[in-house]
């Protein structure tokens, strides 16, 4: 069960390692429906690893392997498929591109063109043409989340064999700036960047003072409303907590951005004791006494982003 030390681990190989040795570890928890009162379904690290291999197997005949980190865009609802896509295309040598759905057509096209993207993946219910128009990229719909996670049968294993030294500078994800002052600029994330976060989460206590981010390594259920096309929702509060640590990220509804109301429901029905949200969510909650009362069991409230 030997594991590379924190700061030298790689998401694809570490997910596979944990799926082998700690298969029942809870990676995340997802809503059973858009009605959050219906409860949440836990996803184990083994479920997550299988879903990645299933998607890699599905995509290999369509996009093949890349030796030059070809860009593969993905558009979908707010669900775990964003994280599955990141690792699945990485195992095939590609890098994922996420363009925020709120972006205008010119913004989407700018990101596709500047990253030399010729392949677009999407969920079945997404109208890609409304986002990218007649862009020449080849388009492929991917399976439903439930099929990727829990289809019968064992998918073929797609190993990630590179060492940390070989992969640390390799790109695996492209996000972008806000575009508030012009066209959004691509931000390429490397495996080395993700490893830096691994190191950061494992900084030991200094003179008895615990580094706050080390709490990511402790076991807790945490509601996060950061979208997966944002670095917060994809890496920092998407992959990192459940792979580098033991926080179980509880996801919001897939069909809409979570407001303060949904955040309260995530805490209530997802049994959360931690929150990761933007200041606007807290403003909504503190101005509603009923919601505020439901937050009594929350022992940590983290915030980030604009209002």
Residue ranges and their predicted role:
Residues 1-68, 162-165:
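N-lobe entry segment of adenylate-forming
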Residues 18, 48, 52, 72, 125-129, 255, 270-307, ...:
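Adenylate-forming
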Residues 32, 76-77, 94-112, 124-127, ...:
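ATP-dependent adenylate-forming carboxylate-activation enzymes
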Residues 38-42, 56-103, 219-220, 224-227:
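Conserved AMP-binding/adenylate-forming
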Residues 42-46, 172-200:
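Conserved AMP-binding A3 loop
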Residues 87, 91-165, 271, 278:
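Structural core segment of the AMP-binding/adenylate-forming
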Residues 195-221, 228-276, 280-282, 288:
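Conserved AMP-binding/adenylation subdomain of ANL enzymes
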């Amino acid at each position: 069960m030997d594991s590379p030390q924190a700061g030298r681990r790689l998401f694809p190989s570490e997910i596979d390692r944990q799926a082998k040795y700690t298969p029942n570890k809870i990676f995340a928890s997802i809503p059973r429906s858009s009605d959050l009162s219906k409860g949440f379904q836990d996803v184990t690290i083994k479920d997550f690893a299988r879903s990645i291999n299933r998607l890699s197997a599905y995509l290999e005949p369509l996009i093949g392997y890349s030796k030059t980190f070809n860009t593969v865009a993905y558009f979908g609802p707010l669900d775990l498929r964003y994280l599955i896509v990141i690792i699945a295309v990485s195992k095939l040598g590609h890098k994922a591109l996420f363009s925020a759905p709120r972006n205008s057509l010119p913004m989407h096209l700018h990101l596709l063109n500047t990253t030399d993207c010729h392949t677009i993946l999407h969920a079945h219910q997404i109208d890609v043409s409304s986002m990218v128009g007649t862009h020449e990229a080849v388009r492929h719909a991917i399976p439903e989340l439930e099929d990727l996670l829990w289809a019968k049968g064992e998918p073929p294993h797609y190993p990630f064999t590179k060492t940390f030294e070989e992969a640390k500078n390799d790109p695996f994800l492209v996000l972008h700036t806000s575009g508030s002052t012009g066209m959004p600029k691509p931000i390429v994330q490397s495996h080395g960047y993700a490893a830096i976060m691994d190191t950061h989460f494992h900084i030991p206590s200094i003179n008895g003072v615990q580094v706050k981010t080390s709490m990511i390594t402790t076991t807790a259920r945490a509601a996060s409303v950061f979208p997966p096309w944002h670095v917060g929702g994809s890496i920092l509060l998407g992959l990192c907590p459940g792979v580098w640590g033991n926080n179980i990220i509880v996801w919001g509804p897939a069909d809409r951005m979570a407001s303060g109301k949904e955040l309260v429901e995530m805490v209530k029905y997802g049994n959360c004791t931690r929150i990761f949200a933007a200041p606007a969510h807290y403003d909504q909650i503190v101005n509603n006494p009923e919601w505020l009362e439901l937050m009594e069991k929350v022992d940590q409230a983290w915030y980030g982003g604009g209002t």
